[in-house]
Amino acid sequence: MPNRLSAPARARSTPAARPARPGTGPLPILASALLWGTTGTASSLAPGGAPATSIGAAALVLGGLLLFLTDRTAWSLPRVCGVRERWLLVVGAVAVVGYPLTFYPAVPRTGVAVSTVIALGSAPVFTGLLGWLTRQGRPGGRWAGATALAVLGCGVLVLGPELAGGGRAVDLLGVLLAALSGLSYAVYSLIAGRLIAAGRPSAGVMGAMFGGAAVLVLPVLALGPVGWLLSPRGAGVVLHLGVVTTFLAYRLFGHGLRHTSAQTATTLTLAEPAVAAVLGVAALDERLPAASWCGLAVLAAGLAVLTLPRRR
């Protein structure tokens, strides 16, 4: 990713500017998507009285603090970076908070399937547009084609069961909230990629942003019911979401951003609903219609276009 910050000359040769190698860029991004794909299965095991926003807030507090406390560069990053970069960290933290606070309220209005498609499908588009507007690089034809395939496959995969059953009425507020969650994801992915391209350590960037987000989201957790956290099931769900789908996944995601542009990364994470669908079939005894399996194949083709090396 081209660096547009007031960065030293070493940023011109940042790894993000070189072609992504599968082992250092796409594979960590895909691994993070695999971990995120367990979110739905894990959250479905939460106690019945646990609000979705509280589950998301608790996971963000735990995972965000782990990302911040386990990397010393995250502690010092706000002090050593410039004023402009500090503001980027603040905006990134707000965007991190914005994702669960818009996505989870969208789910009861539009359903899990529609919310997932809108949020994940819009994120690569927002990332490409924002990256172009902020002069972080114009998306190429390969990215556009792969993203179109991946978004189409994601939509058919996730919406297949609802299309087969007649679907439900569209809730415009739910659609808007889901789109805002996609925008939030795009914003903090771009900011993280920009800071990493400027030479900042990936673990420090993710730790600083998510640590700030953990502090910002604390009131949401404190003002909601917390009794469910004391049950073994509730604690287990939050441990999985906080440690696996937040701490480990975003540590991998940040490492991948060092070698992969944010535009490509947000497209690759469309693998998340594929993982969720397979887990639903394997662990929850769910059934997918033929259309969903076709969508899974199209999605895999789009991801392969981005992941496989170019022909020389």
Regions from the language model: what does each represent?
Residues 46, 55, 106, 133-135, ...:
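Hydrophobic/aromatic residues within transmembrane alpha-helices
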